[in-house]
Amino acid sequence: MKKETKPRVVVIGGGTGLPVILKGLKKKDIHLTAIVTVADDGGSSGKIREQMDVLPPGDIRNVMLALSNVDPRVVDLFQYRFAVDGDLSGHVIGNLILTALSQLNDSYVDAINVLATVLKIRGKVIPATDQPLILNAEMEDGSIVHGESLIPLQGKHINRVYIEPENVKPYPTAVEAVKEADLIVIGPGSLYTSILPNLLLTELADEITASKAPKVYITNILTQIGETDFFSDADHIKVIHEHVGKSFIDKTLINTTTVPKELLFPEDVAQVEHNAKGMEELGVEAIYQDFLSTEDGLVRHAAEKVADALLAMLPNQTNEKE
C-alpha cells in the first residue's frame, strides 16, 4: 500500500481571523484540520447558547463557510443576519441551521459533520471541546469579568484569562489531530478571546507543546481595542507563553506593509509594532513579509501569501491542486 504523503496541517483559533487563513490553505494539497474555540457568548451565538444550552455556533459556522465549496449564494444565505425586531433579531441563519442539526443528531460534532457534507468543505472542523465553558478575565485592577463578550469592553488592561470549569476536557479528535500534525498554526485572531481559550484546555496545550511539528503563530496586523492596545508582535507571543506556562512557539509570520491611515478605524486601532529584540529574547524566528490585504477596504491577512509561507516550513512545499 502506498504511504500517505500529504502533510497534516492543524490551524487553531476562532473569530474572524482564522477563516481568512483557511481560505488560502484549503487550496493546497494537504490534510487540513481547524480546531475552533467555543468560548463565544455574545450576539446570536450567545442567545442560542443561553436558550438551547448548546455550544455557540458562530465561530464554527464562519470556519465551515471559509472551507466550503458551494455556490456563493449559499454562503450569503448562511451568513444572513436578521435585522428585525423580535425573537429573530440579530440571529444568523447559519447559526440556527447548525443548532437545529445538533438537535437532529446524536451530538454537536455529528451536526458539524453533517453540515460539512452539505457545504462540501475541504478539511475537517473540530470544536476545541464539546463541553460548555465560560471565559473569565482578571483585569489589572483586580476586578474579574465573566464572559468572553464582556472582556474587551472594560477599557482596562487584562492580567490573565481563565476558563470555568478549569478541568474542561478537549475534544479527543482535536488532541489526535495535534498529535498527528506536521505543522501547527495558531491564529490570527483576538488574542485573549479567540486564541487563548483553546490553549487553556490543558490536555490540548500539553499535546501542542510536546509536538515535534513546527509551531507557528500568525501575528495580528492590528491591535484590538480592549485586548491588545499598544501591544508589539513580541507581546502577543509573550502572553501566550505565560498562559500556557512554557515557551513553545517556534516561528511567527509578521506583516511588514504599512496599513493605509484611512483604514485605521476606529481611531484607537493601530498597527502592531515590531519588536525584533523581543522576538530574539523569546527565541522565536520572525518571518517578515508583505502579508497585507486591503480588499474591500478591510485590513486582513493575504490568504494566499500566508498559505505559501506556512507550507514553505514543511520539508516538502505543497503546491496548489490542479
From Swiss-Prot:
A GO MF term: LPPG:FO 2-phospho-L-lactate transferase activity
One Gene Ontology CC term in the entry: cytoplasm
Alphabetized UniProt keyword annotations: Cytoplasm
Subcellular location: Cytoplasm
GO annotation, biological process: regulation of cell shape
One Pfam family per UniProt: CofD
CDD domains to which the protein is assigned, alphabetical: YvcK_like (cd07187)
Stated family: Belongs to the gluconeogenesis factor family.
HAMAP family named among the record's database cross-references: Gluconeogen_factor (MF_00973)
Function: Required for morphogenesis under gluconeogenic growth conditions.
Official protein name in the record: Gluconeogenesis factor
Organism of this sequence: Listeria monocytogenes serovar 1/2a (strain ATCC BAA-679 / EGD-e)
